[in-house]
Amino acid sequence: EFINRNGQFTVNLALMEDNVPSFGFVSTPIDQTLYWGGKHLGAWRLRDNTLEPLHTQACQTPMRVVASKSHLNQATRDFIANLGDTTLVQAGSSLKLLRIAEGEADVYPRLAPTCEWDTAAAQAVLEGAGGKVTQVDGSPMEYGKANILNPHFVASS
């Protein structure tokens, strides 16, 4: 997203404890917004000198599915089609996870490659807001592996 100069990039920092993101800090430099939080700490957003707590929302009808602006592959399209009545929310980079934390989306299926540094910080923020991120089989995300690529995953409120 940075290379494409579309303003949808983030700077991500995660504190890892036992290969689990316990705290995350995400910055969106273009709109000067900061997000931070952790599973047992809560989550917040600072924008325009206003500090707001973040909370996921109950799943809406139609379901609000957030997907990549630049990596919407056929597997993701098929996954979304199987959800039934949906509205597509597009965002780039780790902003997709943050849209769920802000209550602006319900689910984010990621069925294309990402790396650990793409998700760990925003996962901590999302979990602080009440959401979750799991591999598509429902098992927890794995970090600190020899292979830094993430498995396919689903984030949800």
Please name every model-derived segment:
Residues 77-82, 97-157:
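Oxyanion/phosphate-interacting regions
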